Amino acid sequence: MKTKLAVFVVLVAALLVGCGCEKRGRGGEGARSDVQEAAMKTYVAPGYMYKYYIFKSGGHSGQVYVYGVPSMRHISTIPVFTPYPATGYGFDKESKEMLGGFTWGDAHHPSISETNGDYDGRWLFISDNANNRMARIDLRDFKTKQILGPIPNVSGNHCSSFCTENTEYILAGSRFSIPLPKGTYEKIEDYATKFKGIVAGIAVDKNTGNMSLGWEVLMPPFNYDLGDAGKGPSKDWGFWTCYNSERATGKLEVTSTQKDRDYVAAVNWPAAEKAIKDGKFKMIGGVKVIDPKNVEGIVYLLPAAKSPHGVDVSPDGKYIIASGKLQSITTVFNIEKMLTAIQKKDFTGNEDGIPVLNYDAIKDAEVNVGLGPLHTQFDDKGNAYTSLFVESAVAKWKLGTWEVVDKIPVSYNIGHLTASEGDTKHPTGEFLVALNKLSHGRHLSVGPSQPEASQLIDISGEKMGLLYDAFTEPEPHYAQMIKADKLKPIEVYPKEENK
């Protein structure tokens, strides 16, 4: 009897040691097995390297956070828009001059430089939503090398930064329409006619990465929210979502949601380049601005489900996917149908001279993904993954057949998501990270203020599987995940650069 009892005690002790954690909530042998399998997929032993880097925007911290995947360990913080005493950034002469007197920023939407639609690992661009700036980080040494701005005529650079297929431009634009040029005054009663929005292309030198203002397009007074650049057959186009096509003021939660559809703005950037070259612009705020009333073929409007937030282009460049967060669908537009509608002038109206394309002529599908769709990423098997803010879930659905094939709950209220190289021409289809707004009950208590939650999800199989919870400083607004072997960081600066 004593021998049996001793064996039993040893077995129980072994199980407790093997778990090494406090299990909360329901679970059993099956749950332990899932936990062990997840641990095997995420564990990176000391001294071993990670398979992917993930670059997360730092929101109001003004910085960029670097993590390793699959371990989800924080590796470093790259100071960008805000002084960082730990390294002296913002205190030495060079970085202080680069910050230009600003002491904070709102870092949104990192974008890794691309060649032929795939990450090339040279630079990381990121926007400052608060102060209308753009920064470039050199991924050779993980240092901020340039801050451009404030960008003239742009107010609230939220719909940024997104690289074109060969990093010719970084897309930018106004979240808030204002009287132009900046500093002028118009009555709010004249908002619909006297206020204007801007979308812009920030030109990038292909050798140095140096940024300069390429072109701006004058737009109706909508709120330009997010964007993406085309690939392949859509490579000449930049896309921006916009809401408040009502041109409303006052209680915007009511006044700006009256229409069933708002728009995705599609800008042909080679046409914008040509217009500037041909002198078809006017000077506003000291820069060259194209007015679509005077120049045809620059921009078109695609009707999209009410208050679209994210717009994402599929890896093959064929589909433009807009997610209307106040409806349960994502709308899939076909680039070939869009170009045909433009050629045939299949329009249903115009906004300040900008043609509105026939919705039924350009859409391929309305996919009923779930409640509160925001953003979409892709894998290498023809699947799309859409974040559902209201439902607190990720929906996996099939391009072409438009069927939802899987869903996984996340904790909680997901905003952005990023998959392994999931916004390039060649996603790898291994991992997805859900960037959640809330995390209550998923960690040791740290008082009333809670960290953000980043949940690592395995997307390599038929069904998605939750692997790991990580917690970040508030508040990541998008991230990108790149293969580690695409980056070639230095550890010692060449002597000739020591000037």
How should these model regions be labeled?
Residues M1-V7:
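Bacterial N-terminal signal peptides that target proteins for export
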Residues C21-K499:
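Predominantly soluble domains enriched in secretory-pathway, periplasmic, or organellar proteins
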Residues V9-L16:
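Bacterial N-terminal signal peptides
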